[in-house]
Design a protein with these regions (language model features):
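Loop-helix junctions at membrane interfaces
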Residues: 1-182
Length: 182
């Protein structure tokens, strides 16, 4: 499902070297399912975009490092969403942009590029996508839905909001002491 969403929303705000919606999907997938699934999702989205949308290999080089590091940073921080965002920014904005240079210069024959040509665009796109992902995931966390998604997907749940609400829940009604029913 994440692959389908990633492919469908990828044309939004997309110019060569910038695809903020891809970073939104990478971070969300990393938090929901972990680094390996996020890496697989980024690879599948990149290949589909390259095959059917004519996107250059930037679809892969600009996604896989950030997707994986986003999940690694999220797990290493024991569930801090901001660390997942920083993992995406570092992985895509720095590593992905530097790897993109030889791919585009030597394999695709692009001229006039230097090693940092894609860095400003990649960092800008990851910041935009990272902000969107952070807002989205924080909203899910505050409502307890993030933990429910993670549980249903079989991922490790780090969400403290979920644990607090589960501890204070009335076993008969399922509502916490602070709950309001409207």
């Amino acid at each position: 499902m994440m692959v389908a969403i990633g492919v469908v929303i990828s044309p939004i705000l997309r110019i060569e070297g910038m695809c903020p919606t891809a970073h939104l999907i990478n971070i969300t997938c990393s938090v929901f399912m972990g680094p390996w699934y996020s890496l697989l999702c980024a690879c599948m989205i990149g290949v589909i975009r390259m095959m059917f949308m004519g996107i250059p290999p930037l679809a892969l080089t600009g996604a896989v490092f950030g997707a994986f590091l986003s999940g690694v940073f999220y797990r290493a921080s024991k569930g801090k969403i901001i660390c997942a965002v920083f993992g995406e920014i570092f992985g895509t904005g720095i590593i992905g942009s530097l790897v993109s240079y030889p791919v585009m210069a030597f394999l695709m024959g692009r001229e006039g590029l230097n090693a940092f040509y894609y860095t400003p665009m990649f960092i800008s796109a990851t910041i935009m996508g990272g902000i969107a992902a952070y807002v989205f995931l924080k909203a899910l966390s505050q409502t307890g839905m993030l933990a429910k998604f993670q549980e249903s997907l079989g991922a490790k749940v780090y969400d403290k909001n979920h644990r607090k609400s589960a501890e204070g829940a009335d076993t008969e009604t399922g509502y916490t002491r602070n709950s309001r029913v409207y």
